[in-house]
Each structure stands twice: as structure tokens, then as C-alpha cells.
Amino acid sequence: MPKMKTKSGLKKRIKITATGKVKRGNAYRSHLAQNKTTKQKRQSRKSSQLSHSDFKRYKELI
């Protein structure tokens, strides 16, 4: 049976680190920023890691 294709939408949104962890960007940044606090906007600039339970689901898509 052939390999499954990688989901290209996911491929553009995540990076896999050298240790095998998955980095992702944060949501809620594209618009309506005036309703969010400065702290929310500042913290959402940082990238975060995908949780272990989510990684199990995403592994099939990668």
C-alpha cells in the first residue's frame, strides 16, 4: 500500500524540531486585535509546542 500524502495545510503551519517536538504558531492573531489585551497579543507572538495528545492525532497527517 502506498504512503499517505502529507496534508499541505498542516505542513505550512508546523515545524518539527531536531528533538522531534512540534512547534506551532498561536491562533487569534489575524484581526479584531483591539478587543484583546496587550498581554494576550504579546504572548501570542511566541510560538508554542504541540501537546503530546495532539501530536498523536497530527502524526497521521504529517
UniProtKB/Swiss-Prot annotation:
Keywords: Ribonucleoprotein, Ribosomal protein. Coiled coil: none annotated. Residues 1-62 are annotated as: Disordered. HAMAP family: Ribosomal_bL35. It comes from Metamycoplasma arthritidis (strain 158L3-1) (Mycoplasma arthritidis). Residues 1-26 have a biased composition (Basic residues). It comes from the Bacteria. This is Large ribosomal subunit protein bL35. One of its GO terms (cellular component) is cytosolic large ribosomal subunit. GO terms for biological process: translation. NCBIfam families: rpmI_bact. GO terms for molecular function: structural constituent of ribosome. Residues 53-62 have a biased composition (Basic and acidic residues). Belongs to the bacterial ribosomal protein bL35 family. Pfam families: Ribosomal_L35p (PF01632). InterPro entries: Ribosomal_bL35, Ribosomal_bL35-like, Ribosomal_bL35_CS, Ribosomal_bL35_sf. The keyword Ribonucleoprotein applies.
